[in-house]
């Protein structure tokens, strides 16, 4: 079996899709069933899996400003959308006996043996959670991927059912390959976490934690409103720590963040390096994730793997991931979310049960299983 794997999602900052791509390709590279693995980036082959580095210098900042400018040019974006898949197809013209896997929705133009991973279809079902330019771009490109793919992988049974329902896609051509988290996410002692806690000026089990992109789909505004309902004494004892890449703008959200920061019960850490995250999770009192829509919900799996109680929403894929280990609520019910957060902070009996159940639930997910399921899916072609 010969595979070409697209590596574009493996870049800083490493999103959930980037993490999936990185963990999967590392294991495909050593899988016995894979006779040959080629890495494809942009429209050319590369020799090594990309390194994820913090691009915080001025050169990277200039690059980011250039990309932001280009994204505001609809004609350039449309030209890229039309031409780039054809450039890729031309570069792949002599590799018809390979299976091509695009792990982030997109595929080159008209390949004979193409697999794509659809992580969710919120661009179609909940377009209000995305910038309009992203919706315009992805709607067209994802329809083309659906037409081109001989097989679709997806990361949850929820996402699989959504694709079948919305697009009437053949069920035998969609395979669920559930995600996992890094082996770095394990329970840790206060001493192990101390360097990271000191770095961010935090206390062991002295905070509630949210990790994820700061964007409307994640319902962070609802989370802040729910947290604001807690007694001020509780909020000051357990401040809400927010960490994640700043997504598309939500002015009301940032006004709430700034207000909570002034009052002393919110801190926004920005994008935290990967090497710090397992310790930031493991030292938290509780993890909160009341998202409106998820294709999987990797952060709650990471939290459970660290032995941290979880409060999350009861919609889309999240119940599938959390099982009976966490407290779940309607993401629109701020009062219920607030009550669950309070219980997760103060109810020691429930916390002990939630920790044990979370660790057991997390063991059901592994990158080895994901890789095996992916390779078995390749065999269907």
From Swiss-Prot:
One of its GO terms (molecular function) is glycosyltransferase activity. It is an enzyme of class 2 (transferase). Pathway: Bacterial outer membrane biogenesis; LPS O-antigen biosynthesis. Transmembrane segments: none annotated. GO terms for biological process: O antigen biosynthetic process. InterPro entries: Glyco_trans_1 (IPR001296). Its EC number is 2.4.1.349. Keywords: Glycosyltransferase, Lipopolysaccharide biosynthesis, Transferase. Belongs to the glycosyltransferase group 1 family. Glycosyltransferase 4 subfamily. Mannosyltransferase involved in the biosynthesis of the repeat unit of the lipopolysaccharide (LPS) O-antigen region. Catalyzes the transfer of two alpha-(1->3)-linked mannose residues to the product of the WbdC enzyme during the synthesis of the adapter region. This is O-antigen chain mannosyltransferase B. It comes from Escherichia coli.
